[in-house]
């Protein structure tokens, strides 16, 4: 167990929080993180591309000319793949690109990213993060008070916080159960609350 600096949302020191070594101090595994991101991106693919094979193309039921005696190559349908306007051979059909990954590897991936954020000093833990109303200006003031620069990923279940960050291109807010490997890697800073840390540790520790 390691003690980590705890801050309030105004950027002031609010004491310390204990981080579980099994979650925030594991040896980062880049290969597993890479596999997790590829899996996550594969699951987002639509997989709706489709072309027609010779049975799906309209027409072509009649043999274009008789089998023998014309001197031309034998043909059975004008919708065969060698014809212009014919069907496509082995073309794409609707499919799901999603695939599974062992639970231990999925958990190791997110733990690796969290540990790397801690190593790189890109992790910020707040005692709480709340807003009375969705105000982008107030949320920007919070980020400035915390001296956060670059792309910032904020973990919060507060609806006002989520709405306040919608217009900020370099800020993304996700609920604690929506924290994922790809977002954590793509954003420079990760902001968690004390309660979020406990919830994450309950699942991953």
Curated annotation (Swiss-Prot):
One of its GO terms (biological process) is translation. It comes from the Bacteria. Residues 44-77 are annotated as: Disordered. Gene3D superfamilies: 3.40.1370.10. Keywords: Ribonucleoprotein, Ribosomal protein, RNA-binding, rRNA-binding. One of the primary rRNA binding proteins, this protein initially binds near the 5'-end of the 23S rRNA. It is important during the early stages of 50S assembly. It makes multiple contacts with different domains of the 23S rRNA in the assembled 50S subunit and ribosome. Forms part of the polypeptide exit tunnel. Belongs to the universal ribosomal protein uL4 family. Part of the 50S ribosomal subunit. This is Large ribosomal subunit protein uL4.
């Amino acid at each position: 167990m390691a003690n980590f600096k705890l801050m309030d949302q105004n950027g002031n020191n609010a004491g310390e929080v204990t981080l579980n070594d099994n979650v925030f101090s594991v040896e980062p595994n880049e290969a597993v993180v890479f596999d997790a991101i590829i899996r996550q991106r594969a699951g987002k693919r639509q997989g709706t591309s489709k072309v027609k094979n010779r049975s799906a193309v309209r027409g072509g039921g009649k043999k274009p000319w008789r089998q023998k005696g014309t001197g031309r190559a034998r043909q059975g349908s004008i919708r065969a793949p060698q014809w212009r306007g014919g069907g496509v051979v082995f073309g794409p059909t609707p499919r799901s690109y999603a695939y599974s990954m062992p639970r231990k590897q999925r958990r190791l991936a997110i733990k690796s990213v969290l540990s790397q954020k801690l190593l790189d000093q890109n992790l910020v833990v707040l005692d709480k993060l709340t807003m009375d109303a969705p105000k982008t200006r107030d949320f920007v003031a919070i980020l400035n008070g915390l001296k956060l620069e670059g792309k910032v990923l904020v973990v919060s279940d507060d609806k006002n916080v989520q709405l306040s960050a919608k217009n900020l291109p370099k800020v993304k807010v996700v609920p604690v159960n929506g924290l994922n490997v790809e977002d954590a890697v793509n954003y420079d800073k990760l902001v968690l609350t004390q309660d979020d840390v406990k919830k994450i540790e309950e699942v991953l520790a």
